[in-house]
Amino acid sequence: KVYGRCELAAAMKRLGLDNYRGYSLGNWVCAAKFESNFNTHATNRNTDGSTDYGILQINSRWWCNDGRTPGSRNLCNIPCSALLSSDITASVNCAKKIVSGGSGMNAWVAWRNRCKGTDVQAWIRGCRL
């Protein structure tokens, strides 16, 4: 599923991401835009053999199990396929675990490079939330 901007913002808000660990909703919508272009089915293979999955491009080396990543830790205790669902609950729950680690949203390269320090509120402007 490819979410609309405001549709995704509403879903993320409903699932408790607004101001989760101090990151406003705009940060999450911005991250999803530049990680997956709002597409829940996005997958990207990395040079280390791991794969990033779903709307927030969650990595199989650490967070989920895809059965093909050597030394996978599966810290969210989920199959990576769960991160490709049109229902973003699994992705959001895993993202909460990731952002609670030491580096916060810096764990997402696209957020660090494209969203951090920008006017992220623009991503939810005009949405009925």
UniProtKB/Swiss-Prot annotation:
Q: What's the further remark here?
A: Lysozyme C is capable of both hydrolysis and transglycosylation; it also shows a slight esterase activity. It acts rapidly on both peptide-substituted and unsubstituted peptidoglycan, and slowly on chitin oligosaccharides.
Name-wise, this protein is: Lysozyme C
Source organism phylogeny: Eukaryota, Metazoa, Chordata, Craniata, Vertebrata
Which keywords, in A-to-Z order, does the entry hold? Answer: Antimicrobial, Bacteriolytic enzyme, Disulfide bond, Glycosidase, Hydrolase, Secreted
Disulfide links within the chain: C6-C127, C30-C115, C64-C80, C76-C94
Name the family the entry cites: Belongs to the glycosyl hydrolase 22 family.
Question: Keyword Disulfide bond, does the record have it?
Answer: yes
Domain of life (superkingdom)? Eukaryota
The keyword Disulfide bond is assigned to this record: yes
Q: Where does the record place the catalytic residues?
A: E35, D52
